[in-house]
């Protein structure tokens, strides 16, 4: 088909010129002459000595970097803690109370509790000299603990014994003695010391009950709970170690030893400051015995009050249980049975209380098929009507009613006497025809 195309189109299908040949610059690979493979011994002198080779650079991984930062932070905290322990002196606190042996420590206070509320709650045990409610120095918010100084040491002991676990503003407080100035070597919790097991670690080691650490009953109950959780399994109890394996097991013994040391130190100080006079020593011993007797009486009074309160609570619980039982039994009964029983009891009481005369009760129209008619009050300006002696119109029964019967065919309709016309009188009573009325026998009188 292309041979029939015009020349201008045939030029489009013409072949291109071939590429011109150029001689190669180098010899071809098969034309070259090689000397074969040689060793590298002669090049060993060009390498450096292995002794002079630098050590490889190690790159720190992500885990190593996190561990390094954690270690550095722990070192800084330990250094700061050591420095604060060296500078800490509880005797130089500005807001501290005067006598530490008459000071009570109150913890776990509600943040909304005010100083006046604490005073009202703790003045029950004795007169209070000073209350120090601790606040944050930066934000000014309460920290949840306070110090209360009593005027007498026996009042402080009474509050220490009876106020522990008291609920103030819907929160149970913890009561303890001040230990910063009474126990040698004592440190607060922020410096690594302190007592209590609520912030030891996780849920498996923290103590959940509210109260002092030496509360043997609470500790025993908590230990039994931990053993029961361990028996149920680690999946439900949250740990396989019991209470005996936790750190800080001997806090109660340590606190008892610290109290005994406090007592010995106070007695030794009193012995040093005492005068050698026999009279003054006897008077002081007499005063001491009086104080002990007073504190003992105060303790006995508190114990009696506690027993009375517990008995009242038990009585109230019994009354509540009885009321619940009575209410349940009432709910089971139907309303009609209750109404009948009340009516019988009321009739019985009225019959026995008034010498046997039973008062007639009003009929209960709810149980009777009686229709009660409402009576209106009698008007003063109108006479009364006796309905009992009045004549009552009675309707005729259908059987006795006289049915309408049409007149016979021979009967003249005009023979029926018309009704009397007023003013004309009656023919039977006035037969005189001059009055304008015809006799009843004349049927055509009314047509005139």
Curated annotation (Swiss-Prot):
Region annotation (Disordered) ranges = 188-448
Report biased composition (Basic residues) as residue ranges.
Answer: 281-293
Record Pfam families: RRM_1, U1snRNP70_N
Give the CC-aspect GO terms: catalytic step 2 spliceosome; nuclear speck; nucleus; precatalytic spliceosome; spliceosomal complex; U1 snRNP; U2-type prespliceosome
Regions of compositional bias (Polar residues) in chain numbering: 426-448
Q: Name the major location.
A: nucleus
Tell me if Aminoacyl-tRNA synthetase is a UniProt keyword of this record.
no
Source species, domain of life: Eukaryota
The RRM domain is annotated at 102-180
Chain residue ranges for the region called Required for interaction with U1 RNA: 91-201
- Tell me, according to the record, the phenotype of the null mutant: Lethal during embryogenesis. RNAi-mediated knockdown in the germline results in defective nurse cell nuclei decondensation and dispersal ultimately affecting oogenesis.
Q: Could you tell me what this protein does?
A: Mediates the splicing of pre-mRNA by binding to the stem loop I region of U1-snRNA. Required during oogenesis for nurse cell chromatin dispersal.
Q: Note the subunit structure.
A: Component of the U1 snRNP. Interacts with Psi; essential for alternative splicing of P-element transposase. Interacts with the SMN complex.
| This protein's name | U1 small nuclear ribonucleoprotein 70 kDa
This protein's species is Drosophila melanogaster (Fruit fly)
User: Gene name on record?
Assistant: snRNP-U1-70K
